[in-house]
């Protein structure tokens, strides 16, 4: 779903294919390989910036970014983010993500992958990739153990190797600013923004694949929400998802409140200092 869009925007920024101020003309849909790709509401917005691509979650916008950077470059970023691999967490029976569509020469496969359709990720695989946006661009292998405390009271830190640099620190800072703007201005029209803390977040509303008939159900969705904070010294990343929620079409309706409740609890519990 659309939580992938920040990764596409970050790749475009990192490849110097776009800037946050870059614009494109949004007609509401594009034609690729005899397929039509629409925005979620099938409306065009005219000339819009990359910031508005995130604010309004425009499918045509991230497809435009792929076109600007080229399919090969886009594919390489997704490979560097290990989206088709296991995340490597120290738990049994982990499975890998599915991005085999990017082996296709068809433009439409890359366009749909840019907004999270036609690919599949595990929650921990998604978290691993999305964490690069807020940690300076490093792809870190997730682990459960930070230290071992012995019976004599001594503590032995468990050290892990640094992750690979996928995005530059400048790209990480730029996409984080954009996602803060999305929360401040667009997420529920800015009503959940916190006055003293920066929060970077993106929602996702993905159609569920119809494994019998092919294609996607029109009325069955997977909602997701990912955010990290405080952005300029990020301490926490929260990833939520729910399968086939009832009574709401979009993830902003179902998962914003749980996210903000968890965020508020963590700020209070760890007494995090304000960052704005």
What does each of the following model-derived ranges do?
Residues 244-246:
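C-terminal soluble interaction/assembly domains
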Residues 1-2, 7-242, 251, 272:
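Beta-lactam-recognizing serine transpeptidase/beta-lactamase-like catalytic domain environment
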Residues 154-157, 256-276:
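Short, gly/Ser/Thr-rich active-site loops of penicillin-recognizing serine hydrolases
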